[in-house]
């Protein structure tokens, strides 16, 4: 392409930054607008596994695979399943042979940010509205000021995207599942017994219509999610989040009767206890192409986290849009080609995520999880053979 559009990317998450990096490598100028005040303004979330065919592929396209290897935790891919009495039902502690290593979200963001000139990103820009102009371009209106014009506005601004309404009237719907997030700091030194319980990876516990996933992160941190099938506003009514001590006690009370070593994970948690209701767009969400507007990642296809595809799909979106823009003679056709491919590509992971959230906390308890873990282990062994 000899003439590139003026490109605004809304959101400095993995998708937005991956797109900016790939285009920067190709000599295409972009501007990334991020509502956070700076890179460390808030925690970026827990750990995630990057898949060879999506997240890792995107980092290869971005020229950051070696940097990825420096932050990849191949040793933290184990899985254990316990019942509420603390009995170990399944263990796969040799998963470091898998090709989907764990990566902390903050570390991933750091390598992406380090690969870009600082002046590409405009921090503290909270988008309020995208307004079309008479000449076909778009102006951006932020909480404090405006920017533009831009020929192409890419919404990489997450589940509650401010760009999405320009192409779609759909909004994410509550899945029926809510997480309560908690964490344990310096676990190896302060709580070695809990470090041993979790091991090098994650544990799952499910019984009595509720569950818990607890996972090792980097820097000796453990992050946990208590899982409930409840109304969307349940957590804010049931917990006093303004008082971490109260919230911690209330959370432990929800698991009364469970093994002390499981409850100890909650009792040892720090003061960062928050509600995370799970929302998703309809499976097959798509829109009619609108010149100058497109979406990446959760803005396009937010799905439940149970399939582990969210960030991976988002980064592959970025890689594919970047490739189309760099290879196509007409940027408008590039966007159309990206959207057509993306709509089909995300169908399968979205269906799997929807099925997973629908069956989470079923009457079968841990039985479905046990079947899943065994099938995953068998598939990995057959692939290795």
Where are these regions (language model features)?
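Conserved mid-domain beta->alpha element of the FAD-binding
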Residues: 8-29, 33-36, 154-155, 180, ...
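Histidine-centered metal-chelating micro-motifs
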Residues: 160-161, 179-181, 209-213, 300-301
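Acidic/histidine metal-binding catalytic segments
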Residues: 71, 120, 256-272, 331-336
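Alpha-helical, largely C-terminal catalytic domains
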Residues: 336-337, 345-385
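Short gly/ser/thr-rich secondary-structure transition/capping motifs
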Residues: 40, 136-138, 205-206, 274-283
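Conserved N-terminal helical subregion
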Residues: 2-10, 22-24, 49-187, 235-236, ...
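Conserved FAD/dinucleotide-binding core of flavoprotein oxidoreductases
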Residues: 90-100, 104-109, 143-148, 185-271
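Glycine-rich active-site loop/strand segments that organize a redox cofactor
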Residues: 45-46
